[in-house]
Amino acid sequence: MPGREGLGLTDRIDSTVNYMVKNQILVLDHNYGLWYERRRNDHERNMHADAEVWAPFNEMPYSRSGQGEAQDRLSKYDLNKFNPWYWNRLKRFVDVADRDGLVLLHDHYNQHNIIEEGAHWCDYPWRSANNINQLGFAEKTVFSGDKRVYMAEQFYDITRPVIREYHSKFIRQSVNVFHDNNGVVHSIGLEYTGPLNFMNFWLEEVNACDNHQLVALTATKDVQDSVLKDKKHTSMVDVIDIRQWHYRADGTLYEPQGGVSLALRQHARLIDPGTVSCASVYRAVREYRCKYPDKAVVYNGSTIRVPRNAMNWAIFMAGGSFAKIPPIDELPVYEKASSFSPIDRQTDMDTQWVMGAVGKGYLGYCVKNEINLDLMGDRETYKVFWIDPDKGTVIKEDGSVRGGGKVILKAPAESSICFLQL
């Protein structure tokens, strides 16, 4: 917003970082806007009548050329020139966020521009009507049912040299701008349902950049699994992002296919996604942590609202990262848990989740009102603490327990955290 700063206007970067720290927000998930300014909010698909733009603005990654007229009646974009204001703002955010250990999850693409609602393609810089670079997308755009757009097949077609060239330029710009930062995780995009060959191309382009920080694999399950089974490309992945698929509560798998030119919402109209449970989310995270122990796993898929923050604790207890669990200031729970591993033989996904390490300690989420622990191989004596899973506060100090046998500990309330500390 020109001349105005604040929430919903032009964000002050230092204020944004301070807000994140104050509210224990670790990650900022960012992608570029669906259009430059607000006139397109009506979702009409016609060229605007004039250039009387409506603020606030969503700056695009590309600069204007000063030539011709795009669909918003401003000059067309030049995809060879990157918008310095846009990239400097992102770079500045990461510079400041790095000081507090925060993370930018950098989505390179916003697939909503090319699939589903046609209005988002109207002003998109890659549309032939909006740039001077001759990418070869047909004009006029044909909207299905006078509304929908299906440009994914053409957009992801890297067999065309011009498309491959401009994707390569954009991907490398998206990575290289952060070459001296730490707190960046690169993702192809939170809604990506595209094909395997484009995902592999994206990974190769990111990997070709020096100091490219961490790389998240965000895709449909078939594409994820193909990448992870491929020795060449799995080595380019640091984080597995479970987002486009899930296990249903009944144990069946919901897995839309990649590369069929459908958005997630469109898949969900063809196949019933069903509902998840804490146990099914735990299962998904644990499965991929076991298969790929050298990679972090984050879960951003379907969830349900459950009491006592159980869904996020399921993610954490299964070994997942970036779970939305509270700080625990009174005890070194997370410091100790960094050396723990989930203990499958002590975990019943419907009643309790347990992690720990012999001689170091244990952490358990007790779904009901007790937790069963097998300490047969552990001779240490541990102090017992019960913790509120919503607030992170200690609700009870419960004496001590000695290893060497099996113990049953009664929780002060259902769905409590049990921490055994040396």
Regions inferred by a protein language model and the residue ranges of each:
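Active-site mouth of glycoside hydrolases
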Residues: M1-V239, R248
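Hydrophobic side chains in beta-strands
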Residues: H30, I188, L217, I242, ...
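Short, glycine- and charge-enriched coil/turn segments that flank and shape catalytic ligand pockets
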Residues: G33, G403-G404
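Generic detector of short, locally flexible boundary/turn motifs and exposed helical patches
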Residues: G68-Q71, V149-Q154, H179-N181, L203, ...
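Residue-level marker of positions within ordered structural domains that often coincide
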Residues: H179, E191, W245, G320, ...
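A structural signal for alpha-helix termini and helix-coil/disorder junctions
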Residues: D180, I242, F340-I343
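Glycoside hydrolase catalytic-domain groove-lining segments
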Residues: L196-T303
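Aromatic- and carboxylate-lined catalytic core of secreted/periplasmic carbohydrate-active enzymes
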Residues: R265-G399, K406-L422
